[in-house]
Curated annotation (Swiss-Prot):
It comes from Biphyllus lunatus. Belongs to the universal ribosomal protein uL22 family. PANTHER family: 60S RIBOSOMAL PROTEIN L17. Disulfide bonds: none annotated. CDD domains: Ribosomal_L22. This is Large ribosomal subunit protein uL22. Pfam families: Ribosomal_L22. The lineage of its organism: Eukaryota, Metazoa, Ecdysozoa, Arthropoda, Hexapoda. The gene is RpL17. InterPro entries: Ribosomal_uL22, Ribosomal_uL22_CS, Ribosomal_uL22_euk/arc, Ribosomal_uL22_sf.
Length: 181
């Protein structure tokens, strides 16, 4: 059992999970972890499934150099976002592990919230790529360590119901012109 960066305030109402030296990009995983922090467990699992299906994006706030813009990032108040599938799958595995730990400990799975999630850099793995004129360049990978714990909350906020589709001014004018013809 490894040491966690910090311990939960109420250890009896918490469950942990961690992964070490995971072969998944550190920067993508860091942004994905930041997106699910403080989310209820059920919402976090649904969100990560939506990321793999490209229905919701992960907002890139810190490691956003060269990241393209996407419309789905507007719901997070930013413009840049991506769909890091491998990071989402690794985090989904860890959440499922923590959920089974909670079930084993006798916690209420429906009231769990992602209280703490942290991604650290692991030791880089070194390979080489061969270039023109006999040169060799490094071909590095950036694995990471992930740790998280879920805490049983007093009450989990229900997902806000999405309001009906709003019609824009352009759509209203199209309907008005169609009605006159």
């Amino acid at each position: 059992m490894g040491r966690y960066a910090r311990e939960p305030d109420n250890a009896g109402k918490s469950c942990k999970a961690r992964g070490s030296n995971l072969r998944v990009h550190f920067k993508n995983t860091c942004e994905t972890a930041n997106a699910i922090r403080k989310m209820p467990l059920k919402r976090a699992v649904a969100y990560l499934k939506n990321v793999t299906a490209q229905k919701e994006c992960v907002p890139f706030r810190r490691f956003n150099g060269g990241v393209g813009r996407c419309a789905q990032a507007k719901q997070f108040g930013t413009t840049q976002g991506r769909w890091p599938k491998k990071s989402a799958e690794f985090l989904l595995q860890l959440l499922r592990n923590a959920e089974s730990n909670a079930d084993y400990s006798g916690l209420d799975v429906d009231r769990l919230v992602v209280q703490h999630i942290q991604v650290n850099r692991a030791a880089c793995l070194r390979r080489r790529t061969y270039r023109a004129h006999g040169r060799i360049n490094p071909y590095m990978s950036s694995p990471c360590h992930i740790e998280l714990w879920l805490t049983e909350a007093e009450s989990v906020p229900e997902a806000a119901k999405k309001p009906g589709k709003k019609t824009s001014a352009v759509e209203k004018s199209k309907k008005a012109t169609a009605a006159t013809h």
